């Protein structure tokens, strides 16, 4: 049970053995377009955040089981840095911004908030809020600023530990 708008039921069914993983299925067009537009979104973010630098591409972190009681891996769309400061930067495409809530708030969809919260928790980049850039219709870009929340991060860890332990029972 998770908060993903699209993947949670399929992933859960795959882990339960009800459904096989379809590795040969092509990614959806919006998913592919999202990756195609990441360099443009990175450029927008850099222009709006002078003094910060971005990694040239995705950055992956592998977290050993002993860190949180379960193994994990996380991939950031970009890692931002300014001096010794680091922050998570994530990019998304949206065909319809109405699903993203009020543009003038930082009320991003729960599954994306959970994603960047986990990214901050796993990387330790918690001193600066994560920034979630969404590129909508007509190339309208909005940045959601998501501060680290220790309570939410702990809840994510708790759920992941329970899930990881459940795999041993299967």
PLM regions: where:
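Charged, glycine-rich intrinsically disordered N-terminal tails and low-complexity linkers that flank
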Residues: 1-36
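Generic structural marker for isolated residues within well-ordered, non-membrane alpha-helices
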Residues: 9, 42, 116
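Alpha-helical structural elements
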Residues: 10, 40, 158-159
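Nucleic-acid nuclease catalytic cores
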Residues: 31, 47-76, 80-168
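Short amphipathic alpha-helical segments
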Residues: 33-40, 152
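Nucleic-acid endo/exonuclease domains
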Residues: 40-43, 55
């Amino acid at each position: 049970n998770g908060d993903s708008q699209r993947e949670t039921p399929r992933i859960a069914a795959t882990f339960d053995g009800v459904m096989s993983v379809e590795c040969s299925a092509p990614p959806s067009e919006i998913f592919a377009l999202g990756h195609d537009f990441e360099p443009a979104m990175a450029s927008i973010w850099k222009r709006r955040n002078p003094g910060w630098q971005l990694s040239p591409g995705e950055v992956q972190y592998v977290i050993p089981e002993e860190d949180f009681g379960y193994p994990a891996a996380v991939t950031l769309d970009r890692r931002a840095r300014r001096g010794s400061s680091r922050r998570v930067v994530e990019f998304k495409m949206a065909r319809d911004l109405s699903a993203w809530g009020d543009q003038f708030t930082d009320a991003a969809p729960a599954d994306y908030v959970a994603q960047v919260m986990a990214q901050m928790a796993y990387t330790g980049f918690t001193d600066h809020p994560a920034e979630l850039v969404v590129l909508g219709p007509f190339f309208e870009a909005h940045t959601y600023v998501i501060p680290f929340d220790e309570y939410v991060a702990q809840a994510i860890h708790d759920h992941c530990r329970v899930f990881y332990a459940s795999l041993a029972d299967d």
